[in-house]
Amino acid sequence: MEMQASRQLAVTQQQAWDALNDPEVLKVCIPGCDKVEATGENQYAIGMALKIGPVSAKFKGNIELSDIQAPASYKLSFEGQGGPAGHGKGSAAVVLTPNAAGCELGYTVQASVGGKIAQLGQRLIDGAAKAMAEDFFKRFDLEMQKQHPASYAARDAAAAAAGAEAPAESGGGGVPIWAWGVGAVVLAAVIWLSR
């Protein structure tokens, strides 16, 4: 499975980078996540529960960051086990590009799954991954609004002055990656699939 998308954020590149590398922020934002902890330099353990169709399981996995170009980009590799429910592994590239409205978070994820999850079919898996990614970004956006209310107020004021609504978020797409880049987006879906 491969997913690629981008998302406009109202925060600066550095603010987004800091949040995507904060285990506590990720734990709040990744659906079903109950554990994100550092196990070494640029290495993390994650725990999460998820349900895809009729398959429910508790997943444990690991993520390792590489090619780190703070605060602009990094790559991450992940693998996870969910017992008989399945397993997954993959990688993601996350890029934060500054712009006048804040920054754009772009990501590309490649992932493979096995076990009962793989038997559900690609359409169901892809749909669940995209839904998890969307949920991650909604949570991440809310967390950024809590941490940086002035950035969002400025965005909303600029949109009102222009007589338009606040900029719509672009793309969607998944990735379970409890890690960075939301990583956010991709991370959540990747983690979900890899567990």
What are these regions (language model features)?
Residues M1-A45, K51, W180-R195:
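Hydrophobic ligand-binding cavity/cleft-lining segments
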Residues Q4, K58-N62, H87-A92:
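Short, surface-exposed coil-to-beta transition loops
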Residues A16-L20, L26, L65, Y107, ...:
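Hydrophobic pocket/interface hotspot
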Residues G32, N62-E64, V95:
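Residues located in well-ordered beta-strands
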Residues A38-E79:
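Glycine-rich portal/gate segments that line the openings of hydrophobic small-molecule binding cavities
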Residues D67, E79-G127:
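Beta-strand/loop substructures that line and gate deep hydrophobic ligand-binding cavities in soluble
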Residues K116-R155:
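A conserved amphipathic terminal alpha-helix motif
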Residues K146-R195:
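Charge-rich (especially acidic), low-complexity segments
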